[in-house]
Amino acid sequence: MKTSSIKLGKNIKRIREQKKMSQGDICRALGFDRAQMSNIEAGKGNPTLATIEKIAQALGVASDELLK
């Protein structure tokens, strides 16, 4: 696992939880399955920039907030 993928996943999970969203909520909004989102949040996935942008939009934040 790359450190950047782990950091991205932690940021997504933190922001999602702050917004009181479940993984199911965000998956439905994005059309993802839970396994895909779980892997991203665990730092096991390597999402494309387009995927990161979709996640950011669903969370109502700028993409760079997820990449910090």
Language-model features: where?
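Conserved hydrophobic/aromatic packing and binding residues within compact polymer-binding modules
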Residues: I12, I26-C27, M37-I40, L66
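Short basic helix-loop element that most often maps to the first helix and adjoining turn
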Residues: K10-A29
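DNA major-groove recognition helix of helix-turn-helix/homeodomain DNA-binding modules
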Residues: T48-E65
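Recognition helix of helix-turn-helix/homeodomain-like DNA-binding domains
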Residues: G31-N46
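Short amphipathic helical patch at the helix-1/turn junction of helix-turn-helix
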Residues: I6, E17-Q18, G45-N46
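Residues within helix-turn-helix
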Residues: G24, A35, E53
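A detector for short, charged/polar N-terminal pre-domain segments
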Residues: M1-K7
